């Protein structure tokens, strides 16, 4: 009661459909035109619509939307393996027919120095990055709230760690092996796991496309 998400609001949702490819039994792995055709009527239902009025979407969280899409698409597209729903650019949910996963993304502006970089390498000097950090969590759906974990709760629980990272020199952190993204991701896991026990993957990028993925779940790093 009283949660802001209980008030009428809207999002620019985006959806990714993941499909397994049979590269042995077919000449064509995935027929994208077929996926477009199957998606078109679902898109027509969802686009510019009050989602709460659609049967099965009385509580349209990113988790319930991903399951709703799965239920309509899977019978027609057996290759469907995951449905991803972006609620905003920085958070969303995945559903594979059985399990829900969510992620929360944030940025960090931090100073770093790589002690183990080769002699003469400029990365041994103090420099900085605007890091992109994405936390992935795997939990059961709360049937009352319609989500696994409130994105706001993830942000609040992670806040003490975020405060230690953002606008700070990371080379001064106690217990961090070095300032490469893999070492930093391992440090973040050690600090965050007691606060977020359902955390099972950390993505940390120092620049776009350059970083580390640390995962300890069965699904591996295939999902975005």
Task: Locate each region found by the language model.
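Charge-rich, low-complexity N-terminal segments
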Residues: 1-224
